[in-house]
Structure formats: C-alpha cells, structure tokens
Amino acid sequence: MSKMLYIIGLSTLLFSCASQKPSTTRKASARTTTTTAKTPVKPGPVTGVPASRPGLTVLHGVEFYTQNIGDITKNDNTMSHGSIVVAKPAGYHVVKTYFPAVAQNFRQRYVILHYTALDEDKSASVLTQQAVSSHYLINNKRNDEIYQLVDENKRAYHSGISAWRKDKNLNDTSIGIEIVNPGFTTDASGRKIFVPYDEHQIKKLAALLKDIVNRYQIPPTNVLGHSDVAPTRKQDPGPLFPWKKLYDQYQIGMWYDEAAKQGFMTQMTPETFMMEQSNSTFIFKVQTFLQQFGYDINPTGAWDKENMKVVEAFQYRFRPENYSGVVDMETWAILQALVQKYPQK
C-alpha cells in the first residue's frame, strides 16, 4: 500500500515543489533566499517605486508567498499553500514588482466527506487507478498516517454532479476526503444497515479537517457530506457518521442549537402537525426551507421519490435516529433551527 501512495502525516504546511529540476550533489545544504514583493501603488498616477513588504520566499528557484495581506472579512487571502505557478513567456521576464494583489481567494471553498464502500486495498486501487479520486484517504489502521492522492491545488473527481446553495459542480471548488468504510448492507425489508466508523479514523479526520478549514477559511456551512451535495444519488458518509461529535468536540461543521429546536417543537402540537403533514402548502414550505438551507430541491408542494431522498439525506446528517425520508415533527423543528442559525448570505 505504501508503495502506491504518497503518505503524509498531519502537517500544516504543504509545499508543491514538483517544478524543481533534479538537484546535483552539494556539500552545503540547499540555500533558501527571501526576497521582498512590492506594495501596489494606491489608485492614481504612478509616482515612484512602491514600498517593499516581506512574504515572497524562493527555494530552489520555486517561489512561495507566505503571508496574507487580503481582507479576511471578505474571505480574501494572498497566502500560497504551495509553490506559485508563473508563466514563462518567450523573450520576456515576469516580475513581481506589484505582487500580490489583495483581491484574491482560494479555489478550495468546500470539504466533502465520503465513505469508500470498499476495503482499504480496493479503495486505494480505485481512487488512484480509475476515473474517480479524492485528495485524501483516511485508512482504518491505528497509526498516524493519512494518504494523500491528489494535490490540494488540483481538481479531484469525487463529487460528480453536485450542488449546494448557489454553487454547482463542487469538484471545482472542493477538497474531497474518502474514509475507508464498508458503507451499508440491506436487510430483508430493504432498509439500509450502515456500518459505524472507528474512533481512530474520526480522530485522524478531525485533525485533517482542522488543518484544511483553518488554512482555507472554510465556513461550517461548507463542510459537507456527499449526500448533502448529491442527495438523490448518494448516501455517504451515512447516518452513523458522527457529525455532532465533530461539531461538539472539534468545532467543525454545522449543528443545530437544542434550545432553538425545542422552541420550534412547542409551536405546533402533534395533532396539528399530523393535520398539516399532508397539506400541500405545508409541504411546499418544508421543501422551501430545505432549499434555503442548501439542498438542491425543487419545491412542488408534493412528496415524490426524488424529494423524499433529499429529506432522507437531511436526516442522515441531523436526525440519524430516523432516516425514513418522511418529515416528522422533530425533523421539521431541526430544519427550522438550522435555517435560523445558518442563513444564506
């Protein structure tokens, strides 16, 4: 397994130095030099040389920018978690006199979690040799290793047709993490029986997620499961994935406030809810709330197989005790509490 994969530990800094030329033997260690980039002139005519500022580092001729001078409130960030890719136009020299512009951010705006539904060897084989991939693979071994399969700056093929809130095709903007887990089996009644995750896998995943969401400023609303972004097609990471534990113990992802849920529960009696449950106006409202929260659903005022899968996906994550695809009173209260806590901007 270790021969096929580039294995990483839990490191907070990744350098993509693939563009280096093979080095020759040296008596001294490789020398790191630091140059300074210049601050752009303020709007108006250029009247002189901009003041310099630190941050641009050169290692073996490969450049890195290690500081953020962007507006953090706008999610702008100038830091490079890897080498800077620079054009090499024939006959011309690209300079960084005014590098970096403050108006930029990361491609990586989402993290999407999956289970592999395979054992470790098959998971590694499929994710590295077929037309599907992920950036990271969490193994099921009790060690300190996490497998990296794709450069974070590259697009992995893990989510397929996907959507969340205003964004679609989330492979373009996400980091994919696969977890070795069998997924589910089906009992005689057709009900899915999911397999729990090992505690050591969750610890690895939490450390990896902490690093990624901190580096790329990924908000809680953008840490998602495959079933969140493709609810009519996918079930992973399933109802036994510990979303609440990630939220409570590691401050990762979303969860509702219990007090808010209870408040919404008291707004309708069980008898009233039973009467409203089949009302088209009420159904349309529930579907609209699912859409407002982020799910790709078209409100129709009626339940069908497709939009019940959206409810099921929501329950996998936030109501795992009941993932029937039917909106009960508690599911409705949880949905309202989440829309209130995490409104779309």
Residue ranges and their predicted role:
Residues 2-8:
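Sec-dependent signal peptide recognition
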Residues 15-16:
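C-terminal motif of bacterial Sec signal peptides marking the signal peptidase cleavage site
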Residues 24-219:
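Active-site-adjacent loop/helix surface patches within enzyme catalytic domains
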Residues 55-61, 65-68, 107-109, 201-208, ...:
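Stable alpha-helical elements in mature extracytoplasmic
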Residues 99-100, 122-124, 163-166, 189-200, ...:
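Second-shell loop/turn segments in exported
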Residues 137-138, 239-266:
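Acidic, His- and aromatic-enriched active-site or binding-groove loops in soluble protein domains
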Residues 218-233:
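Acidic/histidine-rich, metal-coordinating catalytic segments
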Residues 273-285, 291-338, 344:
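Short acidic, glycine/serine/threonine-rich helix-capping segments at coil-helix boundaries
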